[in-house]
Amino acid sequence: MINYSERSAKGHLMVVFHERCLTPYYTSTVECPARVKTIYSKLQDRFPVVRPTPAELNDIQRVHSPEMVARVRAEGYDTYETALTAVGSAVMASEEAVRGYPAFALVRPPGHHAGPEDYRGFCFFNNIAVAIAALIANGVIASVLVIDLDLHNGDGTENIFLGNPAVRVVNISADTRSAYLNSLAQALSKAGNFDLLAVSAGFDTYVHDWGGTLITEDYQAIGNMLRTVAQQACQSRCFAVLEGGYYLPDLGENVLAFCEGLAGR
């Protein structure tokens, strides 16, 4: 891992990663350790990397019921501990963001399909929602814009923050490259001001993945768009958390392109 002080030498964006996310817990074969391994191989020499600690139970229970937490624990030690570590990564990335530094949480399992009472879609705990809820509960921020870039709507995130005026969740979707980028641009132009920009960064919209839409260069453009809006609206307070993305040959390059855009390269 790279020392925290090396940030300026290796890039403005911080990557948060823990090797526990490589654990082969029981899940779908497409949501495999090779996903984060190939991404890490592309990011490790381009950005500083920090190692998180697992999330605390009280943070998890701000957004998930005790009964749901118990069900995740019953999935087995590897699943539960890896899920806690993924949440801890998102929490650390969000803490970087409120200091004005962009951060990317390289995690598995993903989280945006995990709601208050249930979980599905390869998700167990809602990584990004726990991080946001902790910042709000501690009085660090008062308003958040969540942009979900994944092919599938972040229904868990929507359900967690349903009726909460402090958090606005926007899912981006379209059938073509130009329509997708235009949809994102329009959503950002209408967003107004907020204290933090949080991004559920899914890459299954890729042309060779399930979504069959975007190319690698588009992810850099998306990162740039998000960085620009964060600079204008919330003093560069922006973090992203990995969600989907399953086409292994190009997944690392796609995430690298996104991170370079978010870092302003």
Where are these regions (language model features)?
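N-terminal low-complexity, Ser/Thr- and acidic-residue-enriched intrinsically disordered segments
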Residues: I2-Q61
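A general "terminal functional-core" signal
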Residues: I2-H12, V16, D45, E67-R265
